[in-house]
Each structure stands twice: as C-alpha cells, then as structure tokens.
Amino acid sequence: MAGHSKFKNIQHRKCAQDKKRAKVFTKLIREIVTAVKTGSSNIPENNPRLRNALTAARSQNLPKERIDKAINSADDANTENYTEIRYEGYAPNGIAIIVEALTDNKNRTAAEVRSSFTKYGGSLGETGSVNYLFKHCGVIQYPTNIASNEDIFEAAIEAGGDDIVSDAIFHTICTDIENFSKVLEFLTGKYGIPEDSYIGWIPLNTIIIDDTEKAEKLLKLVEALEESDDVQRVFSNYEFSDDVYEIIQGEE
C-alpha cells in the first residue's frame, strides 16, 4: 500500500479541470439530478449516490443554491432524463481510455466521443474492450497536509478502505464500490470534505509516457473528450515519467 504514485496523471487532469470551473459545475449538477432520479429520493440519508454526489459537489465549491436547485429540479417532469453510457477505446501508443458519460442524446454523445478519438489518432472500441485493464472502485483523495501517511493509512483501513497511495500531492484511498459510501462518510467525519471523491476506473498497471510529444498528443485527446458537457470523467492507464511530468506541468 505504498510506492510510486500511479495517480500522478489524476493530478494533471485536476489542474486542467480547475481551469474549466463552469463546465465542472455542469457535470456535477447533472450527476446530482441523475442521483435523485435513479435513487428515487432527494434525501441524502436515503440515497447513497446522492450523498456521494453532494460530497463531490461541495469539494468543488458548487454553490449551495445551485445544489438545492439541482435537487429540486429532479422532481420536475420537464427536467431531462440522462442515460449513463460508458465508452472504451485506445489512444495512440496503446493507452487504454474509458469515458463515462451522462447524456440526453446518445447519438450526439457517441458522435462527439468518436470524433475526438479519430481526430487525435485513437480508436473507439466496443464496451468491454479495455475495462479488464482497470479496477472499478471508489476513489477518495485528500491533500497530503491533511494527515501523515501513517495516520491516513490507519484511518483508511479502519474505515474499510482497500488501498492507499501517498505522494507529494495527495493521499489517494481506494475502496470497494460497496464500501465507498461508508468509507467516504467516515473519512469526511474525520478529515472534512475530500479534495475529490468518485466511483471510477483505476488502472491495474500503467504505461509510462517518457516522450513529451506523445504526452502532449495524448492530453489533447483527453482534453477534447472532457470538453463535452456529456462526459463526466475520463480514465486512462498512462503515467508520465518524472521529466515529462515536470515539462507538462510547466506548460499549464
């Protein structure tokens, strides 16, 4: 439960997301609405998905009035119903990509995702074509200054977490999906709202990108996918080498 962080690319993605706050808010609101509709309750205590969505929204500083409006709008018959879709494919150099989307128009979203893959040298595959390369799990992230490695490790284990990786930026806790809400609630009570929390896809192994040109091309694909309002999150199995990571961060 330690070692070189395979979550370094997550931090880079977060930096990119921070520059697109309005788009992030749109995605958070869409998840809140879907959580209420699919969970048949607008009460967080009775709806684990909504509870998780609200924690994520607060971690990104989504204003309370917008949260309340999203919850209330879910009961409105005129509010769009969103369909959950997962797309899978490959970026250049054999990098696996998983795209999770919430959409009110599947044809539009499929066209946008396929166009992004094609434009940047990737290929969109069938659902299930790459997910075997990932673990589907809950992810909770805290900045490293919130607690020591030892303390966060002990708290994560006590809460029911499965794995934790600490680096210079984040403590990243992974959990079984079934335990995600319980672990998130426990850690939130102990350390406050996390930097990020979600159910997603973590690579079982990573492919090291040690060429800046390849890294930049890969990021263009990922960023093009994230540009879509329908796309909630993008997951992949790449990791930048230290040298490439420093160069990419310097270009932000």
Swiss-Prot record:
Keyword Cytoplasm: yes
Keywords on record: Cytoplasm, DNA-binding, Transcription, Transcription regulation
UniProt-recorded Gene Ontology molecular function terms: DNA binding
Biological process annotations from GO: regulation of DNA-templated transcription
InterPro entries recorded: Integrase-like_N, TACO1_YebC-like_2nd/3rd_dom, TACO1_YebC_N, Transcrip_reg_TACO1-like, Transcrip_reg_TACO1-like_dom3, YebC-like
Keyword Cytoplasm: yes
Domain of life: Bacteria
One GO CC term, this protein: cytoplasm
Compartment(s) where it occurs, according to its Swiss-Prot or TrEMBL record: Cytoplasm
Family under the similarity heading: Belongs to the TACO1 family.
Protein name per UniProt: Probable transcriptional regulatory protein A1C_04175
